[in-house]
From Swiss-Prot:
Belongs to the universal ribosomal protein uS17 family. It holds the Pfam family Ribosomal_S17. Signal peptide: none annotated. PANTHER family: 40S RIBOSOMAL PROTEIN S11 FAMILY MEMBER (PTHR10744), SMALL RIBOSOMAL SUBUNIT PROTEIN US17M (PTHR10744:SF1). GO terms for biological process: translation. The gene is rpsQ. GO terms for molecular function: rRNA binding; structural constituent of ribosome. It comes from Exiguobacterium sibiricum (strain DSM 17290 / CCUG 55495 / CIP 109462 / JCM 13490 / 255-15). InterPro entries: NA-bd_OB-fold, Ribosomal_uS17, Ribosomal_uS17_bact/chlr, Ribosomal_uS17_CS. This is Small ribosomal subunit protein uS17. The keyword Phosphoprotein does not apply.
Amino acid sequence: MERTNNRKVLTGRVVSDKMDKTIVVTVETKVKHKLYGKRVNYSKKYKTHDENNTAKIGDVVRIQETRPLSKDKRFRLVEVVEKAVII
């Protein structure tokens, strides 16, 4: 029997990497308001497990839902989509 993978995959930007093996990722979504039809921006922060400390502040990353790893961590880093440009 084959199991399906229904875990959420989100793309966002790293806003903090000060913790060991943990990053904070902000995911922004645009939703159309039901009554007025205006597009509204929402953002949410997710604490994410980063095993090798590869992601840095400003990087665009892809994260995936996983089992609870701690009190706040429910996501893990899948890949770094785009590295931040340091000026």
